[in-house]
Amino acid sequence: MADRLISTEPATGAEVWSGEIGDAAREVAAARAAWPEWAAHSVAYRCEALRRFANEVRAREKDFADTIARETGKPYWEARTEVGSVINKVEISINAYSERTPQRKVEAALGNKVAVRHKPHGVLAVLGPYNFPAHLPNGHIVPALLAGNAVVFKP
């Protein structure tokens, strides 16, 4: 088995990037160890962290689009659109979270009142597809992080 993962450009066979093959158990353990601290942060803090992420992607938009286009073989305009979707997903998720997860009290059976609260669950695994390597996984990663979960991502 190889020690490194190498991504090649379909059109030319040139190496796009390479990296060490990770140890999944080690990565899950690291995420599990980091999760309590991340989950303890307020939703406002997590929103701000995700907005900083979106700004970092925006600042490197051309580089990300270049990498996606080279690695997948898709047209550059489509790769740019994918990167835009990655950026926009942050605000979409923040708005959806605010609308769908407020703490609220509701009437229950027999006249009882119950409180509905949302809480983080732990570590989530996200597997990325080859055809939309940033946009589709990001659609799971951003909401999971916003909700206070940790994520292990396998591109």
Show where each model-derived region lies.
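Nucleotide-sugar donor-binding loop of glycosyltransferases
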Residues: 155
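N-terminal Rossmann NAD(P)-binding subdomain characteristic of aldehyde/semialdehyde dehydrogenases
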Residues: 50-141
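Short, structured beta/alpha segment
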Residues: 1-70, 92
